[in-house]
Every structure is written in structure tokens, then in C-alpha cells.
């Protein structure tokens, strides 16, 4: 099995608490407002939003795939960290066993920084498509920036 992992840091003018609330805690109701052409809805299939929760994300016509299922592995509100994996859906292209994400939001200078780690686990003998991985990285950064812009435009969302 092959593994590719990448880290990225995205700076935000929002406070760490506000970005964590918007991008992690309220993402189910906020993301489709911030990216209406990309994400149609986020539905909780099981759980209360914390560890063990299963979410079904429905993408719109501008989305990368029709839908994916997320399994929440960890939600730490005190440390503003969130860990989840894609467990089902078209994002798990042939040869890809799983995708895991770790998000940690920290205070920084005049706002915050979102530290985002993504790990792709490939089945043995499968080819790695670097272009698709790069596109996924760009989409993640765009989502964070879209949530930031929405909250700035709608501070009382």
C-alpha cells in the first residue's frame, strides 16, 4: 500500500474560534451558503457531530463528485482540532483505499491559521494520480477561503 500525505497552512483574518466554529462546527449549515454551486447539503446519517458521526456530503454540479461519506474520528473543541476520513463515495477513485484529514486551527498574528493535513492511502499496485491530488489540495484551500469570505460578509450568520 502506498501513502501520500501533504500539509498546508491557510491564513485567515478570522479569529481561531470563529474560523473553527464556521469551518468545523457549523459546516453543515454554512458550507452550502458559502459555496452554493459546489456543495448542495451536508446530512448527518448517524451521531451528533462528534466522534463516530457519519455525514453524507452532496455536491452540486460544480462539485468534484456527486457525494461522499465522512466518518468523524475526533472532534476536540478545546484544542480546535478535527479529524475525519472519507469512507465511501466517488472520491475514493479506483486504487484508493481511504483519505484521512486532520484540521487544526490556531491563533495567529491578526487572525488564525488553519493547518490542514491530508493523507491518501493507495491499494498495492495502484497508480498515483498527482494531478487529482493537487486538485483536491486546491479545493480544500478554496473551501476554507469561501467560508472565511462568507463569515466576513455575514458576521451574524
UniProtKB/Swiss-Prot annotation:
Gene Ontology MF annotations: abscisic acid binding; protein phosphatase inhibitor activity; signaling receptor activity
GO cellular component annotations of the record: cytoplasm; nucleus
Glycosylated residues in this chain: 79, 117
Key words, A-Z: Glycoprotein, Pathogenesis-related protein, Plant defense
Expression triggers: By cytokinin treatment.
A Pfam match: Bet_v_1
Matching CDD domains: Bet_v1-like (cd07816)
GO terms classed as biological process: abscisic acid-activated signaling pathway; defense response
Further details from the record: Related to intracellular pathogenesis-related (IPR) plant proteins and to other allergen families but has no allergenic properties.
Assigned protein family: Belongs to the BetVI family.
Protein's recorded name: Probable intracellular pathogenesis-related protein T1
Organism encoding this protein: Catharanthus roseus
